[in-house]
Amino acid sequence: MIASVRGEVLDIALDHAVIEASGVGYRVNATPVTLGALHRGSEARLFTTMIVREDSMTLYGFSDTESKDLFSLLQTVSGVGPRLAMATLAVLEPDALRRALSEGNLTALTRVPGIGKRGAERMVVELRDKVDAVATTAGAASGAVVGSSIRDQIVEALEGLGFPIKQAEQATDSVLAESPEATTSVALRSALSLLGKTR
């Protein structure tokens, strides 16, 4: 089972991306939101689920573990396969999906192509009590991964700009300790500013 893929983004299409890892190009199906965060030629990491059928092996990729877990949870509902689960996550982001299921919001769920009123009712009945548990465990795991991923990206960017790895790591750790919620771009600018003062 392939749990995640990390490498250079070779291609981005409407419904998938190709990511090269260890010389192999993996085609990973993903939602528009996930694909929108990728950039051709840049490194990316996606959490993946592999669906194996008699005639195919398909990878589905997600930017966080919460989306990945919701994708798996959706497929426990009778009549929901990988395509419909992906369509659901394409229309409803994790928070909106959790709310719709918890509150029994059939209108929100039926906005997904392929989900009618009966299907939406079935989803609510089967998932209402399970969806919060997924969010709690996935949220905790996701935070740790995102934090380390941001750190790695900043250190690599600073190394690419010619800073020694030790200095890059110290500056990055200092910035993230002071502003743990900072985005990658903000943290990178702060680290560059810090390194500029010490040069």
Swiss-Prot record:
Its main location: cytoplasm. It is found in: Cytoplasm. Gene3D superfamilies: 5' to 3' exonuclease, C-terminal subdomain, DNA helicase RuvA subunit, C-terminal domain, Nucleic acid-binding proteins. Signal peptide: none annotated. Keywords: Cytoplasm, DNA damage, DNA recombination, DNA repair, DNA-binding. The keyword Membrane does not apply. InterPro entries: DNA_helicase_Holl-junc_RuvA_I, NA-bd_OB-fold, RuvA, RuvA_2-like, RuvA_C, RuvA_C_sf. One of its GO terms (cellular component) is Holliday junction helicase complex. It comes from the Bacteria. Residues 141-145 are annotated as: Flexible linker. One of its GO terms (biological process) is DNA recombination. Residues 146-199 are annotated as: Domain III. GO terms for molecular function: ATP binding; four-way junction DNA binding; four-way junction helicase activity. Residues 1-63 are annotated as: Domain I. Residues 64-141 are annotated as: Domain II. Has three domains with a flexible linker between the domains II and III and assumes an 'L' shape. Domain III is highly mobile and contacts RuvB. Homotetramer. Forms an RuvA(8)-RuvB(12)-Holliday junction (HJ) complex. HJ DNA is sandwiched between 2 RuvA tetramers; dsDNA enters through RuvA and exits via RuvB. An RuvB hexamer assembles on each DNA strand where it exits the tetramer. Each RuvB hexamer is contacted by two RuvA subunits (via domain III) on 2 adjacent RuvB subunits; this complex drives branch migration. In the full resolvosome a probable DNA-RuvA(4)-RuvB(12)-RuvC(2) complex forms which resolves the HJ. NCBIfam families: ruvA. Belongs to the RuvA family. The RuvA-RuvB-RuvC complex processes Holliday junction (HJ) DNA during genetic recombination and DNA repair, while the RuvA-RuvB complex plays an important role in the rescue of blocked DNA replication forks via replication fork reversal (RFR). RuvA specifically binds to HJ cruciform DNA, conferring on it an open structure. The RuvB hexamer acts as an ATP-dependent pump, pulling dsDNA into and through the RuvAB complex. HJ branch migration allows RuvC to scan DNA until it finds its consensus sequence, where it cleaves and resolves the cruciform DNA. This is Holliday junction branch migration complex subunit RuvA. The lineage of its organism: Bacteria, Bacillati, Actinomycetota, Actinomycetes, Mycobacteriales. The gene is ruvA.
